């Protein structure tokens, strides 16, 4: 995809690094695959704040993404590559041979005019979705299901990818982007290739206003608050705040948050790297 670094004509432009939109081929989404999205401002149904530092931002429409890829054996042509405000990756609009339309996450290398397919008969090529049992060992994959037919849950953000490293009976062993190595049922589907827009990690907003466009409000440190607002607040003058804690009082560094008897722990061969 590439990035753009702007000339320092204003203070907000000086450090601004944004993604290039040269690969995007359509500016308006497919009308049948979008729906209005109501912002919550970080409040729940009773109006209480449940998530801090969220609010405002530009209006967005949600694009329905096909994470299940259930139309097996039906070829689809890539019609457009589009921007999606709801995720870091780009999305691709597919026109199926039977007339159906769907959005998928656009993998790196997928272009307008390419043909993709899903199912066990599909070739292990970029953009095709196959059961893990049919994917060769060593292949780079993304959009991985945790349970068969559930839809892709893992490895969906821009530039991310996992690798199928080996097979163990009815399971395959996959190395995740975090470094975690885990087993997944071989009947689960995954898509070949890595997620596109890999330069997303290099972007810099350049100014606070661009964060506000995305619905992100100023994030205040606990140590500058009052004791009534945060466990690390208060004190005469500038204080360290003591042992780092979250607003709820939980230790912020080193505390294990994973349930000790979680069912899925038996599938994890090697924990993620710090």
Swiss-Prot record:
It comes from the Bacteria. The keyword rRNA-binding applies. Residues 207-220, 244-274 have a biased composition (Basic residues). InterPro entries: NA-bd_OB-fold, Rib_uL2_dom2, Ribosomal_uL2, Ribosomal_uL2_bac/org-type, Ribosomal_uL2_C, Ribosomal_uL2_CS, Ribosomal_uL2_dom3, Ribosomal_uL2_RNA-bd_dom. Keywords: Ribonucleoprotein, Ribosomal protein, RNA-binding, rRNA-binding. The keyword Endoplasmic reticulum does not apply. One of its GO terms (biological process) is cytoplasmic translation. GO terms for cellular component: large ribosomal subunit. Residues 197-274 are annotated as: Disordered. GO terms for molecular function: rRNA binding; structural constituent of ribosome; transferase activity. One of the primary rRNA binding proteins. Required for association of the 30S and 50S subunits to form the 70S ribosome, for tRNA binding and peptide bond formation. It has been suggested to have peptidyltransferase activity; this is somewhat controversial. Makes several contacts with the 16S rRNA in the 70S ribosome. Part of the 50S ribosomal subunit. Forms a bridge to the 30S subunit in the 70S ribosome. Belongs to the universal ribosomal protein uL2 family. This is Large ribosomal subunit protein uL2. It comes from Porphyromonas gingivalis (strain ATCC BAA-308 / W83). The gene is rplB.
């Amino acid at each position: 995809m590439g990035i753009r670094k702007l000339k320092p004509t204003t203070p907000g432009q000086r450090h601004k690094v944004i993604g290039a939109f040269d690969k995007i081929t359509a500016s308006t989404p497919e009308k049948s695959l979008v729906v209005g999205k109501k912002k919550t401002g970080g409040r729940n149904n009773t109006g209480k704040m449940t998530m801090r530092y969220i609010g405002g931002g530009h209006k967005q429409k949600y694009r329905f993404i096909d994470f299940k890829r259930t139309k097996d054996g039906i070829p689809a042509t890539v019609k457009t590559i589009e921007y999606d405000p709801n995720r870091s990756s780009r999305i691709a609009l597919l026109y199926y041979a039977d007339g159906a339309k769907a959005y998928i996450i656009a993998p790196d290398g997928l272009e307008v005019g390419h043909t993709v397919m899903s199912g066990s008969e599909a070739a292990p090529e970029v953009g095709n979705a196959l059961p893990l049992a049919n994917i060769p060992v060593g292949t780079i994959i993304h959009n991985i299901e945790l349970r068969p037919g559930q839809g892709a849950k893992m490895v969906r953000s821009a530039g991310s990818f996992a690798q199928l490293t080996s097979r163990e009976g009815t399971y395959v062993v996959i190395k995740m982007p975090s470094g975690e190595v885990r087993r997944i049922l071989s009947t689960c589907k995954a898509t070949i290739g890595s997620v596109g827009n890999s330069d997303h990690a290099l972007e810099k907003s350049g100014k606070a206003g661009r964060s506000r466009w995305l619905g992100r409000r100023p994030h205040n440190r606990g140590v500058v608050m009052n004791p009534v607002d945060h466990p690390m607040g208060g004190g005469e003058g500038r204080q360290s705040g003591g042992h780092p804690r979250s607003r709820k009082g939980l230790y912020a560094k080193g505390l294990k948050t994973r349930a000790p008897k979680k069912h899925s722990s038996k599938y994890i061969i090697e924990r993620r790297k710090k």
